[in-house]
Structures are given as C-alpha cells and as structure tokens.
Amino acid sequence: LPAMATNGYWSYGYGPKSKSIAGACVAMSFGAMCAASNPASLVRVGNRIEAGASLFAPTRGFTANDDAQTPPYASIPPGEYKSANDLFLLPHFASNYMLDEQSSIGVAIGANGGMNTEYDSAVFARFSPPGVPEYQASAPVGVDLKQMFVGISYSRLLSEEHSIGITPILAVQSISVTGLEPFRMFSKYPDSVTNNGTDVSVGGGVRFGWLWRVNQQLKLGASYQTRLWMQKFDSYKGLFAEAGDFDIPPNFDLGFSYRFTPEWTFAFDYQRIQYSEVNAVGNPADLVFIPGSTLLGTDDGLGFGWNDQNVYKFGVQWQYSDDLTLRAGYSY
C-alpha cells in the first residue's frame, strides 16, 4: 500500500506497480502502464490489459497568523483553515498488443488531480473594498484542477539491446475557481476571474522513449515529454497569465535498473519538470497588489511562482515467489 504524494500537481507514478516503487520505472518493464513513463518498454511486456484505481487522501490547509498589518492593508483573518473533500478516486487503464516479435501498440489512460482546495469561509473578505458588490468575497473559496491523459504508444525493438517508443498524447483538463471576487479589481478581464463554473480545455503533445538492456542485470532508460499545448481557459482568462493559458509543462526522465539477483532489483530515476515554461505556473507569485494595477491575466501576470522541479525516485523490488512480489520506493 503506497503512501501517496505529488510532485507539484504531477502524480509521482501511474498504476500500482509504478507507485509502489515511487515511480522509478523509466528503466523497468513490468506492465502496460509503464508507457506513462517510457513507451519504449512496451515491446518487452507482451500482450496484457490492466485497470485499476487509487484512492488519494491528501491533507490540505494553512494557518493565518495574527501578526498581519492592520487596515488599510488586507489580511486573512487569523486561524486554522482546513480544506474540505479529503478523498479522491484516480482511475487508470492500460493495454498492450504485440504486432509481431519486434513491435507493439498500446493505450494508456491516467490522471492528475486530488489536490483541489475548498474552504467554507470567505477567506478573502478583508480584501473587499466597501460598497462595491462585485468585489465582495464569497464562500466557499477554492480551486479544482483535474487533468486526464490518453496516450497511444508504438514501441519497437531496434536490436536485442535497444528499443524505442513514441506516444502521441491527448490531454483534457478542467478547472473551477470560487471566492476570489476581490481580485477582479486587479485583472485585465475582471469578469473572468472567479465563480464562472467549470471550464474545460483540450490539447496534446508527444512522449518519446528509449530503453537499453545493457546486459541481463542492467537497463538504462530515458524519456521526454513535450509541452502539452492546451486550449486556454477562457472562463478564467482574467486569473491566469497569458489570458488563461494553462499548458502542461514539458518534462524528461533518466534512469536505470539493476537486477542484483533473480529476486532483487533496484531502480533509480531522475525527473525534471519544467514548470517555468508555463507562465501561469512559473511567473512570480510575490507581486504587490497596488490599487489601479493590473496583475492578473497579462503575459507577465501573477503565477504560482514555481521553479523547475528536480525529482529523485528510488525503488526496490523483491520477487519473493511466483505469486508474491514486494516493492518499496521513495520520491524526493
């Protein structure tokens, strides 16, 4: 039973086998869901169908201290704030079909999500200017972002040692934002900041993979996913930088696996997620809100302030018997 976490808003792995070794599977070949990490592995897993789901129970909240400056400076009322909605279902499905001894085609479906927030009180009530109804903060306050990916993979053996793979990816994402009315006054598009229901965008990109079986013990792997170019969130173009642009950032993985004995295998992956490539995520989050300024919805507008993320994944697998495999992993 894996302990669940995320790398930013990315899942650290897709499918139970991947999650159980903290996602360190770019150089592993143990299932069709490995296509989410490295499509080059599929030609080595044979015909198979996999389906399942994970229950994700993150704890989300924050504490507002009582040392904020007094008005006219806005502040959040001091206290403990805990988000509602503690349990999320993340399904997955994957299949692989061998076209011949040298090639295969597969389908994989995965998702990111489960880190939404929903606070029951009007958290930003003190940010509202008096006497302006359209800027009065409401409750609940929160953001709900969901992403789903469908990949169709082709994998081919170039030799006994080398295989490659390519996965065109269809991505669908949705977002809903509530309770941010006071921030309309700082937006280029004040009617497209908050409380506009659920907006959906569709887009896609490509993942490439390579796997090298150096010998019976050592395998090396690498994969690269392009930026996923998405339609803009038009309903929230006044909130996100570049008028609602929320592309999914590119990332790459490098890794190896080493089979010490027929029973024991160790795996390591290095992943880099390039959040700074997407302005809505990478733009600074520490801009000063001055009356009359326009900080939201512009190309240089407020972002999450996230840097590119380096992720290190370690996994170990023990094939105890033909019927039992034990795995453990750590992602940092």
Describe these PLM feature segments.
Residues 24-25, 31-32, 145-146, 201:
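Short hydrophobic/aromatic segments of transmembrane alpha-helices and their interfaces
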Residues 10-25, 43-61:
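Transmembrane beta-strand segments of Gram-negative outer membrane beta-barrel proteins
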Residues 4-19, 69-73, 87-332:
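Outer-membrane beta-barrel porins/channels
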Residues 26-28, 35-47, 95-99, 158:
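Outer-membrane beta-barrel pore proteins
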Residues 23-30, 59-86:
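Surface-exposed strand-loop-strand hairpins of Gram-negative outer-membrane beta-barrel proteins
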Residues 33-42, 151, 311-313:
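Generic detector of contiguous secondary-structure segments
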